Amino acid sequence: MDGSHSAALKLQQLPPTSSSSAVSEASFSYKENLIGALLAIFGHLVVSIALNLQKYCHIRLAGSKDPRAYFKTKTWWLGLFLMLLGELGVFASYAFAPLSLIVPLSAVSVIASAIIGIIFIKEKWKPKDFLRRYVLSFVGCGLAVVGTYLLVTFAPNSHEKMTGENVTRHLVSWPFLLYMLVEIILFCLLLYFYKEKNANNIVVILLLVALLGSMTVVTVKAVAGMLVLSIQGNLQLDYPIFYVMFVCMVATAVYQAAFLSQASQMYDSSLIASVGYILSTTIAITAGAIFYLDFIGEDVLHICMFALGCLIAFLGVFLITRNRKKPIPFEPYISMDAMPGMQNMHDKGMTVQPELKASFSYGALENNDNISEIYAPATLPVMQEEHGSRSASGVPYRVLEHTKKE
């Protein structure tokens, strides 16, 4: 009897099994994923509100007689503060959740901009144009929300403390070095075709942006994770890898913004938003999976559902940006009959318009119809003076004297 009682006591004192510890680790990983996802959603939502506030400030100043500059208004400064707050939230989210989860959540900013643009900015629409124009946008918002839910639910649960040793080990690993070699070769080829061959296709430019952006998010996660550990008491700022990652983060972000600016000068913003989101998200998830090993240990079902969430979010963003209004470009128009004393350049009195092929130049004037002939610049006819010699120097134009009628 005593032997059986002692055996029961020993069984009660056994440590918890590995299955219970695995369940607790999975629960902790899901909580960290949820914290990171909420921070990212909050950050993107606040950034969208900030951008629309600043847009509202510019619209209000343009439509009023207020002589103040935009940076002297409280609305613009409130938008700037909210933008910094949102970017800080997105930056902090990388320290809690895997990179593969945070990157696709930028679809939240597209959803918020579509809704705020209609409500806050009061973008007007006619009832007859509602079905044609806005139904697809609302369907896109719904698909993007469904995709975001799938991303959060089936996101990878790989969590690793971003210590200096771990970041250095990932940086010199063979898979990432091979990935870096392929990315550098591809980036150089795209840059060559873009600069030397004038390959101004939007996919070429946004691929350059996406390749730089993948390095930006990899370095952002390392910097954010090391900063959070330092705040918690485990100082990581004395590792040189922290400063290497910080410099790479700033440099890639600056060049990424430069290429985005060039793309915005040639293509519509809605097209840039949809194509850029798809390319940047795909390449960034690939970089995160190689550098941080996000999908190691994940089962096939979770990976497939995560990929399905990405595809649904891609489709939602495409539908949202597909029907945005395209701005009408400014086309300068010159009517030669409006100039007093100037005869029409053409016999039938047709108006002429500047040639707008490469630059805003008035070097040649082109007829309005489809004639391909380009006329020379207009000049005033040279008139010889009646009372002077032909070789006399002076103004080669005849002066017309006007007298007032009493």
UniProtKB/Swiss-Prot annotation:
Organism annotation: Homo sapiens (Human)
Record keyword Cytoplasm present: no
One GO-annotated biological process of the protein: magnesium ion transport
Primary localisation category: membrane
Annotated positions of the Phosphoserine modification: S372
GO CC annotations, alphabetized: membrane
Molecular function GO labels: magnesium ion transmembrane transporter activity
TM stretches of this protein: 33-53, 76-96, 101-121, 135-155, 171-191, 202-222, 240-260, 271-291, 300-320
Protein family according to the UniProt entry: Belongs to the NIPA family.
Keywords of this entry: Glycoprotein, Membrane, Phosphoprotein, Transmembrane, Transmembrane helix
Keyword NADP tagged: no
Membrane topology: Multi-pass membrane protein
Glycosylated position list: N166
Subcellular location: Membrane
Protein name: NIPA-like protein 3
